[in-house]
Amino acid sequence: MMSKPHHATLESIKYTPGSLRLLDQRKLPLETVFDDVLTVEDIWSAINEMRVRGAPAIAVSAALGIAVATQRKVANGELKSGSEVQAFFLSSCDFVMTSRPTAVNLFNCLRDLKEQVEKLDPTKAAAEVAQACVELAEAVYTKDVAFNEGIMRHGAAHILAVAKAEGRDKVSILTICNTGALATSRYGTALGVVRQLFYDGKLERVYACETRPWNQGARLTVYECVQEGIPCTLICDGAASSLMLNRKIDAVVVGADRICQNGDTANKIGTYNLAVSAKFHGVKLYVAAPSTTLDAKTASGNRVEIEEREPTEITTNMVTKQRVVADGPHLSVWNPVFDITPGELITGGIITEKGVQAPTASAPYYDIASIIAQP
């Protein structure tokens, strides 16, 4: 029987009607700073500059940010009719979708919102249309919390069942990046699974890759684990293969920014490395993500646009802002934020709020459309 998840103590999205504050995750763990989101430009910048990050959190923040900006414009008289409110909300969705290219949650969320807002009656008063937009945006947050709860319960129960069949009562998990409460509305996806195992007393230890160059594992995942007392070991990214060789790892559990129709998965750079090594060492790899991350319209990973960021993220110390790499005319820097893990290497399964989908025995290993179609 699956356990009920506990209440996570961390909160990166603080929302009340008319107000949105986002935790600036670039400053963690040294500083805890919340930024007010007042305009559509504010939410675009927060996403683009990675003050808010994690595919589910980006989508939720975008929806709420646009809603708050709409409310403010109605309150100060800039939007005087229902049709103006509707037009502003729709154009804001289009604008915010340009903030980052790879995570499909943002696009799925805002496209769905647009479809619903387009159905609103523009002849109604501005305040009434704005309130309807706000309620639609708030539903995005509520739904993501429920998705997190489903993912963590299904994932933990499945992984524990596999371990018990092999005679083990506790499990050790390897993960990358940050996929917890800081990356979602509350509990997390991959780290949510880890949380549930911990709450159930079944987690031996989670191993967190530091996740260069932004160090989301070292800065954020470790921060979450320390806050909740979750047993955690931080490792360098390059130590993952050696870890799987020398210590018992029951599963690699990662998040996703986009899962294509055939199971190919875009996730934080370094995930592909983990998948290759896990396959070699016989360790099951799972992808944990809400159904909003599933992209049945994109056939395979070679059709996904991979975001590349500034070279300074690699050459400059994040805290001191000093350059720590020699410079010269023949030096170039390649800084992709994501990589593509082929569905063939997702050997454990895809964990969503609907359950765990195991791979088939031969290609294509996954049928994402069939998962989406499940109730």
Curated annotation (Swiss-Prot):
The active site is at residue 257. Its main location: cytoplasm. InterPro entries: IF-2B-related, IF-M1Pi, IF_2B-like_C, Initiation_fac_2B_a/b/d, M1Pi_N, NagB/RpiA_transferase-like. It catalyses: 5-(methylsulfanyl)-alpha-D-ribose 1-phosphate = 5-(methylsulfanyl)-D-ribulose 1-phosphate. It comes from Leishmania infantum. Catalyzes the interconversion of methylthioribose-1-phosphate (MTR-1-P) into methylthioribulose-1-phosphate (MTRu-1-P). The record marks 177 as: Transition state stabilizer. Pathway: Amino-acid biosynthesis; L-methionine biosynthesis via salvage pathway; L-methionine from S-methyl-5-thio-alpha-D-ribose 1-phosphate: step 1/6. GO terms for biological process: L-methionine salvage from methylthioadenosine. Its EC number is 5.3.1.23. This is Methylthioribose-1-phosphate isomerase. Keywords: Amino-acid biosynthesis, Cytoplasm, Isomerase, Methionine biosynthesis, Nucleus. One of its GO terms (cellular component) is cytoplasm. It is an enzyme of class 5 (isomerase).
